[in-house]
Amino acid sequence: MKDMPTWIDEYHKGSRFGLNGKVLLKKNSKYQEILIIETDFYGKALMLDGCWMTSVRDEKYYHECLVHPALSSIDKKSHILIIGGGDGGTARECLKYSQVSKIDLVEIDEEVIKVSKTFLKEIGGGAWSDKRLAIHIDDGVKWVETTKDNSYDVIFIDCSDPSEFSNLLFTDSFYKECKRILTKKGILATQSESPESFENIHIHILKSLNKIFKLSETMYSFVPIYPSGIWSWTFASDEELNLSKVNYKEVMEIENNCDVWNLNFQNAAFKMMPNKIVKKLNS
């Protein structure tokens, strides 16, 4: 299997998405099975417990959409928390902003970071050696629960789909704790699953954030290797959430360093909520 190209599939609710390639690494960590695959089209890719997580070719569709709507619109962004994010892509995008002075990246599975540093160097880029990034191998829920009030300007939840060790990252109690440790005008940004392949979880996340925060907005775009291809990211705040109010000079500089995100892309993506989701949120 490690020498010959083969089709490697993710199975989800009677469907599957396969990539042709060679397995470069297969190992079990304390939490999950980890595969690194050299795919024919998407380059090196990370698979966790049989689910595609990211690839060198398509990762920016995910990471740029998670990070830039929040960081381009908030004035104070010096202290950032990333829950998960072991591939380094979210940290890389955050570090494009000179105002960011400290990032705490809390990843429960150290092996994900190790294999990403070795095999997915294009994704983490220079983030791993940036002095502003502090890596903590810890449980994200416990980290948030033990953090002082008003500690972070932005929190990014960059986690995998709900599982035995990540379910608590999708609960009301966790979102309330995140709210507590945000600064007054802070923003919570989270991947909020697919409105197609994970509709029930998606609805749960949006309803929870609508209930816990005064303001929330959801954007939709595509991540090619994820189930159904369509994905979402939700942003929430209690004081201010004007995601189109940006520093245009700064945005132009960021846009020039992005492959997917720009302000026009973002503005359109926030208007793409499927009507079935609208109706279920209002029911």
Swiss-Prot record:
Gene3D superfamilies attached to this UniProt entry: Spermidine synthase, tetramerisation domain (2.30.140.10), Vaccinia Virus protein VP39 (3.40.50.150)
Residues holding spermidine: H63, D87, D158, C159, S160, D161
UniProt-listed Enzyme Commission number(s): 2.5.1.16
Molecular function as annotated in GO: spermidine synthase activity
InterPro entries: PABS, PABS_CS, SAM-dependent_MTases_sf, Spermi_synthase, Spermidine_synt_N, Spermidine_synt_N_sf
CDD domains: AdoMet_MTases
Summary of subunit composition and partner proteins: Homodimer or homotetramer.
Described function: Catalyzes the irreversible transfer of a propylamine group from the amino donor S-adenosylmethioninamine (decarboxy-AdoMet) to putrescine (1,4-diaminobutane) to yield spermidine.
The name this protein goes by in its record: Polyamine aminopropyltransferase
Organism lineage string: Bacteria, Bacillati, Cyanobacteriota, Cyanophyceae, Synechococcales
